[in-house]
Amino acid sequence: ELHLFGGGNQALEIEDYVRTHDKGVFYHGSLPKERMREELTRYHASIIPLTVRIRGAVPSKLFDLLPLGVPILFCGGGEGEEIVKENQLGLVSAPGDYERLSKNIRAMSHLPDEEYRQLKANCLRLSQTTFCFERQLEAYKRFLSAF
């Protein structure tokens, strides 16, 4: 199954497609952030698309997923791709490379349990260390106090 959440300019097209094709795809629309966090923990992975690369930008969805321990299927390049690869948080495909994304979805669904558990653990570890909001805020305060 593939469960899609969110809005945006293609929401109506997605709704129409899902309604007219019985392919195990479900579109849920937009949910409030807290409900979304709760919902995401029910799934094995989450797709993070980044169609337009912005130098220095990392999709905020990455930071939302890490503390939930949800492995990532990243579709994009740049810093987001590097973070996912270097920290073994999931699998990566180029923007628009639907063939690779499809292969990554299949690969993720067939990972041995130990490898899958390690991806989840890597997500949780990174959320508590490098990308811990409180730690980043303290580092920022120390940086500002130096001036």
Where are these regions (language model features)?
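Short loop/turn segments at beta->alpha junctions
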Residues: 31-32, 58, 69, 76, ...
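Short alpha-helical segment that forms part of, or immediately flanks, the ligand-binding pocket
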Residues: 37-41, 59-68, 81-82
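Short hydrophobic beta-strand element within catalytic cores of glycosyltransferases
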Residues: 46-48, 64-75, 91
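Nucleotide-activated donor-binding/catalytic signature segment of Leloir-type glycosyltransferases, i.e.
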Residues: 3-6, 11-37
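A charged, aromatic-enriched C-terminal amphipathic alpha-helix characteristic of glycosyltransferases
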Residues: 96, 100, 113-144
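Short glycine-rich donor-binding/catalytic loop of glycosyltransferases
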Residues: 51-52, 70, 74-81, 95-96
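Acidic donor-binding loop of glycosyltransferase active sites
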Residues: 40-55, 70
